[in-house]
Amino acid sequence: MLVHGFTTESYLREITIPAIERGAAAGGRERSAIELSLPAFVVTGPDEATMAANAAGVRSQIAFYGSTPNYRGVLEHHGWGDLQPELNALSKEGKWVEMGNLIDDDMLHTFAVVAEPTEVAAGILGRFGDVVQRVSFYAPYATPAGFWAPIVAELQEG
C-alpha cells in the first residue's frame, strides 16, 4: 500500500496506521500482512547552499499539497489548519513562491528529513523504519549520478 507523501511521522503513526489497522481487521487481515511504501520528503545536498536551494523545492511541494482542501487534516493534526485556506488562495493566484515561503523551518523539519547525505538514512529509519517496509525519496531537485546509492545501501542495511 502506498502511503501519501504528504504525511508526517506523527500523522502516520497516530492517524494513518490506526486507520489501516481498522481496515485490515474489518477485512479479516492482520496489519502485518500489509506492506507500506512511503515517498519520504528529503532535503539534503553536498553543501549548505545546495541544501538551502533543495529546501526551497521541498517547501514548495509541501505548500502545494497543503493548498489542497482534502489534505487539511494533516495540517490540522499539527495545529496548522489555518494555513490551508491561505495556501489555497495563493495557489489560485499562481503565487507559488509565496506559498513556499509560508512553510517555516518547523513545518519543513516535521514533513521532511533534513540532513546531510551521511545522516539521511538514519533520519528516515528513525522516523519510519519500524512502520514502513519500503521507502522512496521525495526529493524534487536534481542530484548527481550515484548520489543516492550510499543512502540506499545504508537503508538496506538498516
Predicted regions and their residues:
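Active-site-adjacent structural elements that line small-molecule/cofactor binding pockets in enzymes
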Residues: 1-158
